[in-house]
Amino acid sequence: MYIPDSYLDELIASDIPSGIDLTTHVLGIGAQPGRMEYYTRDAALLCGTEEAARIFGRFGCTVAEALPSGSMLAPGDVFMTVEGPAAGLHMGWKICLNIFEYYCALATKARQMVDAVHAVNPLCEVLSTRKLMPGTKPFDVKALTLGGAFPHRLGLSETVLVFDHHLTFYGG
């Protein structure tokens, strides 16, 4: 699933509204070259490396190595290595860490649920609802589908689903 640049730009703007990491700027270390690795503490289903690479690219960093979303990780596995100026590494670090922490966990839990359901009935599927935190849908859907679950309904425009409150206006 492709997550639009505009969505990633919103994540960046919400974390770095002024466009600089003030601490790195004040310390005068922004131009120093660096290397950073992301690794996991627990077994997990990876989600978000493609988007993290695009975020770091906006800050002048390059991805030296990265596993693709959907990879199974064991504790201690390094799944992404990024190189670039300290300013870029610091600006991308926390945004991407939050993506990894939340959406690897969601993908992993979805996978566990799908595996548990399929152990009982391989023909049964796990479906997600539209009850998502506002603004999180792109990553939620990506993580859930990586975990093997399916979105029941992505939006109001794709299917007809009549609730009691619709019937109130319909006359019955």
Where are these regions (language model features)?
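Acidic/glycine-rich phosphate/pyrophosphate-binding loops and surrounding catalytic core
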Residues: M1-G172
